[in-house]
Structures are given as structure tokens and as C-alpha cells.
Amino acid sequence: MANVKLFDQTGKEVSTVELNDAIFGIEPNESVVFDVVISQRASLRQGTHAVKNRSAVSGGGRKPWRQKGTGRARQGSIRSPQWRGGGVVFGPTPRSYGYKLPQKVRRLALKSVYSAKVAEDKFVAVESLSFAAPKTAEFAKVLSALSIDTKVLVLVEEGNEFAALSARNLPNVAVATAATASVLDIVNADKLLVTKEAISTIEEVLA
């Protein structure tokens, strides 16, 4: 099993933590990660685009001129697609772009991105992230002590609200619970800052 250094909030190394190789030590499957990222990005699309077809455009109920005898081309409505102000043919309609991949694929993708972060030395383990009250300055001190100055995803245990509130005003810092972090969240971050309890949660969820 792989070992990573465990730090406290002051940046001091206190011990090491053992990681489960079945989750944090596999060969990353880039193809699966790609598929899951595309799926999750598709689910984020709003999908509210809409245009009016000829049945939705107002007006045009009357035939503009008689069928025969005028010398002009026959027309049934001034809201036909060939008219200015007419309906749009085959235009976009509101829809959901989301689709689900099998659970096995999603789990493999999570294991792959966690393993990649550990292999690239972009996985920082911290004993805990506990604050007496939501304080952005206190969270900034923790990041500085751990020499984290890039885009970071902080994974905390369920119920640690003060950590999330303390970090939300900091640029390039995102907070998620260990059980709900997505592949897209992890891929978007340069580094992961994970509490010891969150590591246990990840291993429980993906075991």
C-alpha cells in the first residue's frame, strides 16, 4: 500500500497515512475518465434553447392571396419558413443533454483520477480542517502553510460546514465532501487537499 505524508493545519508533518492500492494505486484509465468527464459536462448544459416553428409563430392564419389567377407563386400562410418572420424549420427545442454511464465505469473513473493525483504527487493529506468559526483568513493560512498556491479541491468529511464557508471566498479553491466529489471536480483541480477522515470515506465508498 502507498503511504503519503500526513500534515496538521500548521503544515507540520505528523505521520503518514496508508492508502488503499485498489483505489489510489491503480493504472489510470484515461479513456474511461474522458467518457465520464464528457458525461458530467453534458449534464451541466442548461438546454433551454428554443425557437418558434410555424405553428408557434403568431399570425398567418389567412391565405395571403387566392390560389390561382394572380401570376404569383401559391402561398398558404405568411408564417411559412420561406417568409420573413416565418417559423424556423428543425430548430432547437428545450431538452436535457444529460446521460448516465454505468456505475462500474463511474467508479473506475474516480479510482483513476485519485490514483493519478497520488502518482503525480498532487495529493496532500491533512489530519483535519477544523475551525471555531467560518474564517477565510484562517483557511488561507492553512493553504499557505501547506505550500498550496494553485487551483485546489478540498475534500472534507460530511458536516464540516465551517471549512466550506471559510474557503468559498478564496480564488481557485473549491470544497466538496468526499462522498460527493465528481470526476470533473477532481480533474479541474491542480491539487487535492484531503482530510484523514475524508480518505476513509473515499475508501468506504469505492471499496
Swiss-Prot record:
Keywords associated with the record: Ribonucleoprotein, Ribosomal protein, RNA-binding, rRNA-binding
Superkingdom in the source lineage: Bacteria
GO cellular component: ribonucleoprotein complex; ribosome
GO terms under biological process: translation
Listed GO MF terms: rRNA binding; structural constituent of ribosome
Family annotation (Pfam families): Ribosomal_L4 (PF00573)
Gene3D superfamilies noted in UniProt: 3.40.1370.10
Entry annotated with the keyword Chloroplast: no
Region of interest (Disordered), ranges: 49-78
Subunit annotation: Part of the 50S ribosomal subunit.
Biological role stated in the UniProt entry: One of the primary rRNA binding proteins, this protein initially binds near the 5'-end of the 23S rRNA. It is important during the early stages of 50S assembly. It makes multiple contacts with different domains of the 23S rRNA in the assembled 50S subunit and ribosome. Forms part of the polypeptide exit tunnel.
Family: Belongs to the universal ribosomal protein uL4 family.
Name recorded for this polypeptide: Large ribosomal subunit protein uL4
Organism, as annotated: Streptococcus equi subsp. zooepidemicus (strain H70)
